[in-house]
């Protein structure tokens, strides 16, 4: 899981954050 920025949002196998 990856959380580059913002709040963690689960998208597929990767967790990304909104701008």
Curated annotation (Swiss-Prot):
Protein name as catalogued: Neb-colloostatin
Role, per record: Has an oostatic activity. It inhibits yolk synthesis so inhibiting the subsequent yolk deposition in previtellogenic follicles.
Source organism superkingdom: Eukaryota
UniProt source species: Sarcophaga bullata (Grey flesh fly)
């Amino acid at each position: 899981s990856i959380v580059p920025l913002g709040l963690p949002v689960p998208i597929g196998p990767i967790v990304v954050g909104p701008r």
